[in-house]
């Protein structure tokens, strides 16, 4: 049975949610600057939430020629600590460690993956390890962790790949119904830094438009914060 203190906390929490919702109008379209301002003023959680973007694209992701996927280096970073694993031959392990990799190895890491031990956010591999890594493709693939040359995670340039992963590289991929979702920094970032990240991400997705696509490419865009409000972006305000 709840005591008076518990009831007071619930009432206070409910009031904060109502007040937050009142600051964002569901029937209004916002430009990026106003959207960031509104989301900050409407946030009521006690942790530092992530600014999230959802983009609806006019593609059919079931067709291979309409796949939209890539990576973006966010100018202001993500605000998250990224654990990087590097799978390489023994002669390059010291190089990977010196570059800041959190986990370095070869078949030992692959064995850990098979055992369900995945203690990393990004997996980088040298080309000569890809045959061996193929044995865990079904495990890494669904988690978005499979090294891919198109994403810069299968490379001979280990140092630069680690640097990119640690400094705020974000992968994007259109899922079913042409939806792209990504986190683009913490709400505690300055408005300027969040806008830099937003513009860099949006520009990259727009440039990734399939060459043969007919009709409208960018259908809708929404910004939100973790456990917070969501606002729709006025697409005419996107340069």
Curated annotation (Swiss-Prot):
Coiled coil where? Answer: none
Keywords assigned by UniProt, alphabetized: Repressor, Ribonucleoprotein, Ribosomal protein, RNA-binding, rRNA-binding, Translation regulation, tRNA-binding
Q: Please provide, alphabetically and separated by semicolons, the GO molecular function terms listed in this UniProt record.
A: rRNA binding; structural constituent of ribosome; tRNA binding
Q: Which GO terms describe its cellular component?
A: large ribosomal subunit
Matching InterPro entries: Ribosom_uL1_bac-type (IPR005878), Ribosomal_uL1 (IPR002143), Ribosomal_uL1-like (IPR023674), Ribosomal_uL1/biogenesis (IPR028364), Ribosomal_uL1_3-a/b-sand (IPR016095), Ribosomal_uL1_CS (IPR023673)
Pfam families associated with the record: Ribosomal_L1
| GO BP, one annotated term | translation
Q: Provide the function of this protein.
A: Binds directly to 23S rRNA. The L1 stalk is quite mobile in the ribosome, and is involved in E site tRNA release.
**What HAMAP family would the database entry show?**
Ribosomal_uL1_B
Tell me which family the UniProt entry assigns to this protein: Belongs to the universal ribosomal protein uL1 family.
Q: How does it assemble?
A: Part of the 50S ribosomal subunit.
Protein name, UniProt field: Large ribosomal subunit protein uL1
- Supply the source organism for this entry: Rickettsia africae (strain ESF-5)
The gene coding this protein: rplA
């Amino acid at each position: 049975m709840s005591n008076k203190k518990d009831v007071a906390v619930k009432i206070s929490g409910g009031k904060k949610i109502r007040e937050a919702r009142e600051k964002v109008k569901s029937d209004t379209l916002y430009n990026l600057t106003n959207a960031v301002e509104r989301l900050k003023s409407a946030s009521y959680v006690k942790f530092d939430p992530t600014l999230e973007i959802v983009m609806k694209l006019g593609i059919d992701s079931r067709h291979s020629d309409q796949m939209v996927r890539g990576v973006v280096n966010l100018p202001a970073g993500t605000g998250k600590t990224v654990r990087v694993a590097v799978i390489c031959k023994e002669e390059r392990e010291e190089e990977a460690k010196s570059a800041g990799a959190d986990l370095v190895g070869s078949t030992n890491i692959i064995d850990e993956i098979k055992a369900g031990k995945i203690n990393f956010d990004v997996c980088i591999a040298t080309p000569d390890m890809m045959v061996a890594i193929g044995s865990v493709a079904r495990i890494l693939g669904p988690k978005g962790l499979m090294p891919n040359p198109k994403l810069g995670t299968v490379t001979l340039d280990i140092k630069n790949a680690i640097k990119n992963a640690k400094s705020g590289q974000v992968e994007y991929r259109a899922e079913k119904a042409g939806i792209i979702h990504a986190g683009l920094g913490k709400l505690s970032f300055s408005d300027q830094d969040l806008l830099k990240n937003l513009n860099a991400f949006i520009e990259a997705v727009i440039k990734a438009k399939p060459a043969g696509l007919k009709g409208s490419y960018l259908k809708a865009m929404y910004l939100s914060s973790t456990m917070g409000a969501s606002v729709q972006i006025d697409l005419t305000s996107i340069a």
